[in-house]
Curated annotation (Swiss-Prot):
This is Protein U62. Pfam families: U62_UL91. It comes from Human herpesvirus 6B (strain Z29) (HHV-6 variant B). InterPro entries: U62/UL91. Belongs to the herpesviridae UL91 family.
Length: 87
């Protein structure tokens, strides 16, 4: 998972033009066709790729925090809401 995200990050960092960005987004949507159909409009594919990247980043961040502290962000939020951390 981390290698896939690093590849995506490297692709984004190497963007020099808007067209480069759209090519990366198109590549993501083609490789993740379970997220969005190819017949969708470009704005919809851009939105789906952004949502996918955001969700993956949050999950990885939570996993890193969990490994470092023995509890994750989600666990702290549940604990703050008075819920059992194990649920």
């Amino acid at each position: 998972m981390n290698s896939a995200l690093n590849e995506i990050k490297d692709d984004f960092e190497n963007c020099e033009t808007k067209n480069d960005l759209f090519k990366i987004i198109d590549k993501i949507s083609k490789n993740c066709n379970f997220i969005v159909e190819q017949v969708e409009s470009l704005p919809r594919r851009v939105d789906s790729a952004a949502i996918l990247f955001d969700n993956l980043a949050v999950e990885i961040f939570n996993d890193v925090i969990y490994r470092q502290n023995g509890d994750g962000v989600a666990a702290k939020i549940r604990q703050g809401n008075g819920q059992n951390i194990d649920t």
